[in-house]
Amino acid sequence: MANNRSPITEQRRIAHIADALAHEQGEYTRLGEEVGIVGAESSLEREGMVILPDIDGPNEGNHSGDIYAVAYDEDSRPRSLHVVAAKGYSHRLRTRPVDGAYATQGSPEYARHLMLTDRCLHAALAKDPVLRRGILDGSIEVIADVYRTPRPYMSSVIHPSAIPVPLDRAYASTLQSIVRQHPDYTE
C-alpha cells in the first residue's frame, strides 16, 4: 500500500509524535523521581529514622539533596545523619563537578558538597544545635546512602550502599560558618 501523504504532512506527523514522546519521557522521569523519594522515605521510616522536614528534594536546583534523615540511639540522641540519593525506576546516579573532579550521587564527595551548598539543610542545622554540634565535632556520623525503588512497590526498595562521610576540621569549620549565617541559627 503506497503512502499518499505529502512530505510536509509526514514531517508534521513525525514532529507531533516526537513532541508527544518528549513529553511522556519527562513525565516518566518525574514519576520515577517521585517513586524514588516515596520508596526511600518509606524505607528510612521503617528503619526508624526521622526525615528532616522542609528539604526541597530532587529537581529543586543543583545544590539540594533528595532526602536527609537522622538515626537516633536508644536514648533518643542523634546517632547519624544520612545524606540520601533516592532513585526510582532505572534512573542512574548523576554526577557533578566538585572541587575539579566529578562526584557521583551517593559518594562521600557528593554528600560533602551538598552539605555545603544545600540551603534547606543549612536551615535545619541552624535550628537544631544538638544535631549540628554532633556533626561538627564528629560524634554524629554522616553517611552517604543510595536507595533505589525500581518498581512502584514499596517492597522493592533496594539499599545498595551506605558509605561513611569523613569530615575534617577545616570542612567542619566551613560548614559552621555557613550555617551560623542563617537567620534561624541558635546556640
Question: Each predicted region: which residue ranges?
Answer:
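Non-Sec secretion/translocation targeting segments of pathogen effectors
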Residues: 1-5, 67, 184-187
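Catalytic cores of nucleic-acid endonucleases
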Residues: 23, 27-28, 38, 50-60, ...
